[in-house]
């Protein structure tokens, strides 16, 4: 862990920066709270009585060891400590777009550069910021965050906000957040998140193969089926709206078409839920819209995943060589980075959305 004297900088680093003292203060105090209350997982296991959480924490340690041993992810104290929090999410990120565009607003700060979201430790603060942006006419989305990375500045603890997730989802989160610690490109949310998702997906595939557990395999296959349906729905809706927004139609007609597209999206989702037997994990996402901001938020995480997957394949699946290539790309200016990634991945196209 870095000295607490550096905490102000790290808070700016992990949150989507802001010039106000209030914003930085909530980031500093929120991060301190997580760190000072964290306990080593072995010590928690000695006294915990909840058998479900105990088994989950044992699994966390095994996944954490696998991440460094087999995936080449950072070997440090992250996810070897545990913090109990009294809320469903640790952070809430605010996303905003214009009403007829998917161009996500950016917030900038000195250390991490510019990112397409702004994070708060208190939901009420995130909702207040979203209301302020909505009053200006923006589409807004507030996304709950179960875990995040301080990019190696601190030893990120395992949080109660996701300890009860399915084992496959816990593995995803740990692999994803450790991938951020390994490398980070300033001012490029899509690059950073797409890279981390590609590591998460490859890591999960390898971890599952090592477990020889049919229940885990079924858990993964079911989750992937739901995720693929959701992503396809987002992709179809976004493609339809991008075509509409780029047309010569009047803004009034575009707004009407937008409303129709999102209503059709809701109907498709309800039909999908019936086919899933009532699985409702995406209800939170739909409850706030959907709108341009919520679609943009999804796309930020997966837009360039196919390019990173192609780059890994070009390296023969060798993760250390893949990481070296990605680090080299991260060091380039953003425009050059995008061209180099496209070339390095054999011209593989990026996803319009998830």
Describe the residue ranges of each PLM region.
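Positively charged n-region of N-terminal signal peptides that target proteins for export
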Residues: 1-4
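Bacterial N-terminal signal peptides
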Residues: 6-16
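Bacterial Sec signal peptide processing site at the extreme N-terminus
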Residues: 17-39
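Amphipathic alpha-helical packing elements
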Residues: 31-67
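Solvent-exposed, acidic/flexible segments
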Residues: 34, 53-60, 119-126, 163-172, ...
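Acidic/histidine-rich, surface-exposed loop or edge segments in extracytoplasmic proteins
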Residues: 35-49, 107-115, 288-290, 306
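Acidic/His-rich structured neighborhood in mature extracellular/periplasmic domains
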Residues: 62-227
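Pan-zinc metallopeptidase signature
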Residues: 232-354
């Amino acid at each position: 862990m870095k000295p607490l004297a550096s905490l102000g900088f790290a808070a700016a680093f992990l949150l989507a920066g802001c010039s106000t003292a209030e914003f930085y203060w909530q980031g500093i105090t929120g991060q301190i709270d997580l760190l000072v209350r964290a306990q080593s997982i072995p010590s928690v296991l000695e006294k915990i009585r909840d058998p479900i959480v105990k088994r989950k924490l044992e699994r966390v340690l095994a996944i954490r060891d696998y991440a460094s041993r087999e995936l080449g992810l950072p070997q440090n104290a992250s996810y070897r400590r545990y913090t109990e929090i009294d809320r469903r999410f640790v952070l809430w990120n605010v996303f905003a777009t214009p009403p007829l565009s998917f161009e996500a607003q950016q917030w900038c700060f000195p250390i991490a550069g510019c990112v397409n979201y702004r994070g708060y430790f208190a939901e009420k603060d995130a909702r207040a910021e979203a209301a302020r942006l909505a009053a200006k006419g923006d589409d807004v989305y507030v996304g709950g965050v179960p875990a995040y990375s301080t990019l190696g500045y601190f030893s990120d603890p395992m949080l109660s906000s996701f300890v009860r997730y399915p084992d496959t989802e816990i593995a995803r989160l740990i692999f994803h957040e450790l991938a951020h610690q390994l490398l980070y490109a300033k001012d490029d949310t899509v690059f950073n998140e797409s890279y981390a998702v590609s590591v998460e997906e490859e890591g999960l595939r390898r971890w599952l193969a090592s477990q020889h557990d049919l229940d885990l395999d079924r858990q993964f296959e079911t989750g992937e089926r739901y995720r693929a349906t959701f992503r396809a729905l987002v992709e179809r809706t976004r493609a339809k709206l991008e075509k509409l927004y780029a047309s010569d139609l009047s803004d009034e007609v575009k707004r009407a078409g937008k409303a129709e597209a999102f209503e059709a999206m809701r109907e498709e989702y309800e039909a999908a839920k019936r086919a899933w037997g009532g699985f409702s994990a995406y209800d939170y996402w739909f409850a706030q819209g959907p709108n341009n901001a919520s679609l943009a938020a999804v796309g930020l995480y997966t837009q360039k995943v196919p390019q990173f997957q192609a780059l890994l394949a070009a390296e023969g699946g060798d993760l250390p060589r893949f990481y070296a290539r990605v680090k080299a790309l991260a060091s380039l200016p953003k425009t050059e980075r995008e061209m180099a990634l496209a070339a390095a991945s054999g011209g593989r196209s990026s996803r319009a959305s998830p």
